[in-house]
């Protein structure tokens, strides 16, 4: 069998473009699913994606700049590789000049470039399966409880090769587990918890199970509340969903064009503006413990925060907010040069630190709340107005009423309307940062570490009948 590294070399050898970049990603994935407190399915798949980026100098005239063509396939064999290379060259000839041109990154081959792709197998869930079996045998306190959920482990190996001599390889493991518990006699009573892991060896599944059972216990008393502004504690998962939305809009070009909440009049930006008096730092870091990401940029398509010309550029820590101040925007190299910014790669993980109560657990925030709400997670989040980053969405799987520092019952779900930028400004207390799994974004953005936060006036704009 031809190794992935050999396929990338074959593509570069076949290329007739002036310059060429080849990306190949091989993904090994195992999954486990359960429902009604019974294991239902498991599976293992291996997939491959293969992209060729051809760069043609003056393809449509001598005065034109370089044009690019990107074509993807699955890299099944050499015939397909050659077909993708030819199609990429044809696409480049038919394209107009690229707007994000920068010199391709030079380099040499890493020692592990010829190594095969890393893999996973169904055995990664061995301990989890035993812990699930024990949880299935435990009916839970009070009414009988049913467990539903899904565990997934993906190991993606990426090879990046360029006509400049650059050869890079990266292995990205991603593991997630989501657990939903319901009361057998009333399936509208539901609780959720999730976790991120790289290899399932550090997963505390009994603690996850205990948490959803605790929340189901809180739902024994059902209450109705109207829409309004409530003091609200958001757990790390919900905070993560909101911070991801914010970070992904922190793009240099769109901000200079006046199209984001970080824009200022006259084509300027809000860089340097204090967003909150709390010493909060929101950052991405490829070397973050337990949340590591690729140390180099790899993308098969250009967009406002990344460019195919930047493939192979080293990534680095970026403080998007620094001690409460807007500190960075994402710029490809070409946009940075044009707009007077600094090359800044887009985030692939996200951490929020520096809270007012940096050692406080969510239980501590609850104990200090006279009357308010405790959320489980957010769902179906959509952007309403980009220049203020106003978002709308729904609460899900448990909203709990707090009185006198204790949970006294479960209330109805709500639709909310909030901007994460404005939320940070109004946040009263921030607890300890911990690794978490967001609910809405976890399929695309799983690596986050967030604190719980307390907002004195979270806008529950209407009651939701969803359950």
Predicted feature descriptions by range:
Residues 249, 267-467:
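Dual-mode signal for accessory low-complexity, basic/Gly-rich regions
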Residues 1-307, 322-323, 404-406, 443, ...:
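Active-site bordering "gate/hinge" segments
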């Amino acid at each position: 069998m031809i190794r992935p590294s050999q396929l990338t070399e074959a593509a570069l050898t076949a290329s007739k473009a002036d310059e060429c970049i080849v990306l190949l990603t091989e993904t090994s994935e195992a999954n486990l699913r359960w429902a009604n407190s019974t294991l239902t399915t498991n599976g293992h798949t291996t997939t491959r994606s293969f992209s060729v980026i051809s760069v043609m100098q003056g393809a449509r005239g001598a005065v034109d700049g370089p044009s690019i063509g990107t074509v993807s396939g699955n890299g099944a064999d050499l015939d397909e590789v050659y077909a993708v290379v030819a199609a990429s060259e044809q696409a480049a000839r038919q394209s107009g000049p690229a707007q994000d041109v920068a010199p391709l990154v030079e380099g040499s081959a890493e020692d592990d470039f010829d190594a095969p792709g890393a893999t996973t197998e169904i055995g990664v869930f061995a301990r989890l399966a035993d812990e699930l079996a024990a949880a299935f045998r435990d009916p839970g306190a009070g009414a009988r409880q049913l467990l539903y959920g899904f565990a997934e482990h993906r190991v993606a190996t990426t090879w990046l090769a360029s006509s400049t001599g650059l050869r890079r390889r990266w292995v990205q493991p991603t593991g997630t587990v989501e657990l939903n518990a319901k009361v057998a006699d009333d399936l509208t009573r539901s609780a959720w918890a999730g976790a991120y892991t790289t290899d399932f060896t550090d997963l505390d599944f009994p603690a996850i199970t205990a948490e959803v059972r605790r929340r189901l216990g809180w739902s024994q008393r059902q209450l109705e509340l109207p829409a309004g502004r409530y003091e609200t504690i958001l757990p790390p998962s919900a905070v993560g969903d909101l911070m991801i939305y914010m970070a992904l809009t922190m793009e240099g070009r769109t901000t200079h064009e006046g199209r984001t909440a970080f824009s200022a009049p006259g084509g300027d930006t809000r860089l340097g503006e204090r967003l909150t008096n709390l010493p909060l730092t929101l950052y991405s870091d490829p070397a973050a413990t337990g949340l590591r990401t690729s140390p180099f940029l790899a993308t098969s398509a250009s967009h406002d925060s990344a460019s195919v010309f930047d493939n192979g550029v080293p990534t680095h820590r970026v403080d998007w907010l620094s001690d409460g101040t807007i500190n960075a925007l994402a710029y490809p190299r070409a946009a940075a040069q044009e707009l007077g910014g600094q090359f800044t790669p887009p985030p692939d993980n996200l951490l929020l630190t520096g809270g007012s109560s940096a050692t406080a657990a969510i239980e501590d925030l609850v104990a200090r709340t006279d009357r308010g709400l405790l959320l489980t997670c957010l769902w179906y989040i959509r952007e309403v107005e980009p220049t203020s980053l106003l978002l709308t969405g729904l609460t899900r799987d448990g909203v709990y009423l707090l009185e006198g520092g204790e949970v006294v019952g479960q209330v109805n779900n709500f639709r909310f309307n909030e901007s994460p930028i404005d939320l940070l400004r109004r946040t009263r207390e921030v607890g300890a940062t911990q690794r978490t799994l967001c609910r809405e974004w976890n399929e695309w953005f799983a690596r986050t570490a967030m604190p719980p936060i307390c907002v004195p006036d979270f806008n529950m704009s209407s009651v939701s009948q969803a359950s």
